[in-house]
Amino acid sequence: MTQVKKEDIHVIIINCSSSYNLEKTLLTLKSLEGRIEDITILDEDHINLQINNYSLNKFIQRLKLIEEDIGTTLNNHIQKIECDYILFLNNNAFFTSNIIQKMLLLNDNHQLLTYKNLIKGEIIESPLLIRTSFLKNNKFFKKYQIPFKEALFSSWLSRIDKKVIKNVDREFVKHSPMGKSQFTSQKNEFISKYQNEAKSYESMPSISIMISNYNMEKYVEVAVNSCFLQTQLPQNIFVIDDGSTDNSYENLTNWIVYPEFKLLNTENIGKAKALNKVLECIDTDFVLELDADDWLDPNALEVIRGYLKSLSQSVALLYGNLRLWKQAGIQDVRYAGIRKGKPIFDKNELISYFFPLGPRIYRTSALKSINGFPVIEFKNGRMYEDVSIINKLIKGYQLSYRDFTVYNVREHNLSITKKNHSDWSDFLKYLD
């Protein structure tokens, strides 16, 4: 039986919405006073948290965010912590009177303690107590690797072996209301999918993912990471950097340690030509095209494979609905609705489609049978390559719309389609 030690816990308080709620959180720590070595409060610039007449003031230190990046800030801070455990209190969390010291212990088989919390209708599992040594070797994702900051803990938990996790059933952690919280129901619904169990896909159709990147260093790692944080992994993830002038390619090289990840680079040749280079490498049954600034739901491939297994051989493209988010700051997005797809059968219906058709899951053999993405004269194939390829496929194959939503579209100022919307009418003149 693990014995209680003195001063073996470092407390980290994150995302506290007011001074009142901070005081409430701190007061409930008094029952742990003998075990607390330090208390770190993560200061976010938009909140001025005050602490008045609190007996544990001697333990408290403030920590400023590094470049608005919670993951990086925590990773750096944790490397300096020497005590056995780190206790996370996030989103106005506090202990109830039911807390007992022996519940905040881990035996030799467990590395972390979690609890389940009901947030706006979704049950979210959250880390509570983690061995410091384990955290030093299992770092949190950086801000440009997760879609929004609220996904930090759930995305981290999703890659941890369930065998080392102890979940506490008793309700001894609660949360004060967040007020105008950034936790929308849509974000919580997304986050809850990180908790889905991994599923076998040995007998399912094989699928690769291809991403063409140009100067999307702020977003492309979110796209890549979303391919790995899946309940069913893809066979391969191909990323081609199309001559970026930012730090995209350098950042992408960090992912080559994963065997499924394949990184290519080229001078700036445009998206159609870049994707054709990737297509030469693909040998799976299907390939999903993921834009470098978009991302997938954690169960996306599980859902998609479910449709692919019964897809007619005459179908060259499977697509569904799109979930739209608007960029609102460095690490925040706001839900902007669902773009519901519809069946299309000919060129006229294709060009009258009000938004990009997606997600686009191509039958690889069909793509190769028409020699890949057309490089038309308009902009040398650098725009509307999705419409060009679908227009070519629809002449000899069927398209299949199914009502599913697993693909997240990011609207932001760097979006090429948004910037060049007026070119659409000119593009149509080149479409045969």
Tell where the protein language model's regions lie, with residue ranges:
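N-proximal low-complexity "stem/linker" segments adjacent to membrane-targeting elements
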Residues: 1-28, 173-226
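Acidic donor-binding segment of Leloir-type glycosyltransferases
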Residues: 29-65, 224-264
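Glycine-rich, basic loop-to-helix element that forms the pyrophosphate-binding segment
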Residues: 66-80, 266-282
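Short aromatic/hydrophobic "clamp" motif used to bind/position activated sugar donors
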Residues: 86, 287
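Conserved donor NDP-sugar-binding/catalytic core segment of glycosyltransferases
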Residues: 93-121, 301-332
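A recurrent flexible, glycine/aromatic-enriched loop bordering the glycosyltransferase active site
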Residues: 112-130, 343-361
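Acidic donor-binding loop at a coil-to-helix junction in glycosyltransferase catalytic cores
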Residues: 145-153, 379-389
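Catalytic beta-strand/loop signature of glycosyltransferases that borders the donor
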Residues: 164-172, 321, 400-406
